[in-house]
A protein has these predicted regions:
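Single conserved hydrophobic/aromatic residue that forms the stacking wall/gate
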Residues: 1-14, 18
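Alpha-helix N-cap/helix-initiation motif
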Residues: 3, 7, 186, 190, ...
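Active-site-proximal, well-structured secondary-structure segments within enzyme catalytic domains
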Residues: 65, 94-97, 104, 108-149, ...
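Short small-residue beta-strand/loop micro-motif enriched in glycine and branched aliphatics
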Residues: 157-158, 225-226, 381-385
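Short histidine-centered catalytic/ligand-binding loop motif
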Residues: 160, 170, 281-288, 386
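Active-site recognition of the HExxH zinc-binding catalytic motif
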Residues: 391-402
């Protein structure tokens, strides 16, 4: 199959020094290509001719496709004098590099954070799965006891289940101060990057006729103005505040203490268990990752009349990543799909779906499309089994839906 080894994808899913170098080398080339394509006056004129020649009965989708393309040419500065076009291109190059560095600093700050623990009592409430992973990480780094890292499964487990309030507070501060001037590692402070991104976005927006970046951003969205967005958010907050305050009061009454941010997830889990006798950890046994993926593909097969077949011979970027050939009921291969489900060092947090090979080549010929699903679930235990929470299952199905 067409490999998903492009540097932009691997920078998020399997970053190391070599892949990051490849990413940094490819980024300015791709940025230059994208900007020059968007500023190509001949291409814009071709779209304008298509727009002028649309028949009266052209579909709304067709009209919108052309209108959006023409809009995007304008947003890229196609109408500007040459010296301003050049400045816009320079800004796009700078933004691409700074935003990449912003992401890398968050990743590096997250990977560098670790908390050694020698007393098992400090880890009360954490599952066997989390403890085994922490013990293995300590052993890997030549330490005794446990080493808790800031990968999302560990962070979520501590914030939701750790009885040790001080441990939860430590993790909370570690998470929210990553790559900041208040974080544990000043070398990855992103404050300057934020200032530079804001300034460059503002300048780019001004160049193409907007007062600020907020207006520029909304040119491709449903909201008509920044003021409309702020009004919507304030209205939403006014309707949500009473309910939120009532729920917070319930947590205070339930716990008998002043509720801090690092207490909320923990107390919500305790309250849910008391009121409804439901435990997210207890539900894990029903959701082995392999069974969830199998069920996902079975549902897709019923809905779309396709089949997914794992191909272990395909070389991937990590042993956790698997490749599936997608075939129709007649056995014809119609695409491919990668899954990369488990958290690890060098991998961006979160969950996302994207394509790495499009359906058509630039010359218009068809090729097999390939997509990928990336998540950050708890890695398999010593038995090779990863048990998901119900929220994890929802995440898998949500992302696959894209």
């Amino acid at each position: 199959p067409p490999p998903a080894h492009n540097p932009l994808y691997l920078s998020s899913a399997a970053s190391d020094v070599y892949k990051r170098q490849a990413y940094n080398a490819a980024l300015p080339i791709l940025t230059e290509y994208g900007t020059e394509l968007s500023q190509n006056a001949r291409l814009q004129q071709a779209y304008a001719r298509v727009d002028g020649g649309l028949p009266a009965d052209a579909s709304e989708a067709r009209r919108n496709a052309v209108a959006h393309a023409l809009r995007d040419f304008h947003l890229a500065g196609v109408d500007l004098p040459e010296h301003e076009k050049q400045r816009f291109r320079e800004i796009m190059q700078s933004l691409a590099a700074i935003q990449a560095d912003f992401d890398h600093r968050i990743q590096d700050a997250s990977d560098a954070w670790a908390l050694p623990v020698d007393d098992a009592d400090e880890l009360e409430g954490l599952s066997t799965q989390v403890l085994q992973r922490a013990a293995a990480e300590a052993s890997r780094r030549g330490r005794e006891g446990w080493l808790l890292t800031l990968d999302y499964p560990t962070y979520h487990a501590v914030m939701t289940h750790a009885e040790n309030r001080g441990l939860r507070e430590t993790f909370y501060h570690g998470w929210v101060t990553r790559a900041s001037d208040q974080g544990a590692n000043a070398e990855w402070d992103n404050s300057d990057n934020i200032d530079r991104i804001l300034a460059l976005r503002h300048e780019a927006a001004n160049l193409v006729g907007f007062r600020n970046y907020a207006e520029y951003s909304l040119a491709t969205k449903m909201a008509e103005s920044p003021e409309q967005v702020i009004e919507f958010l304030r209205d939403l907050a006014s309707h949500s505040r009473l309910a939120a305050e009532a729920e917070l009061a319930e947590l205070r009454d339930f716990s008998g203490m002043v509720v801090e941010p690092w207490d909320v997830s923990f107390l919500l889990e305790k309250l849910k268990q008391e009121k409804f006798s439901i435990s997210n950890e207890a539900l894990r046994q029903y959701f082995p990752a392999t069974m969830v993926v199998s069920g996902l593909f079975e549902l897709a097969s019923r809905l779309y009349d396709v089949e997914f077949a794992s191909d272990p011979d395909v070389v991937t970027w990590h042993e956790d990543a698997l490749y599936y050939r997608v075939r129709n009921r007649g056995g014809e291969e119609i695409g491919g799909f990668y899954t990369d489900l488990f958290a690890r060092s060098g991998k961006r947090t979160g969950a996302w779906v994207d394509d790495c090979v499009n359906r058509k080549n630039l010359n218009g010929s068809a090729t097999l499309p390939v997509g990928f699903l990336v998540c950050n679930f708890s890695p398999p235990d010593e038995r090779g089994q990863s048990l998901l929470t119900h929220d994890d299952v929802v995440t898998v199905f949500h992302e696959f839906g894209h």
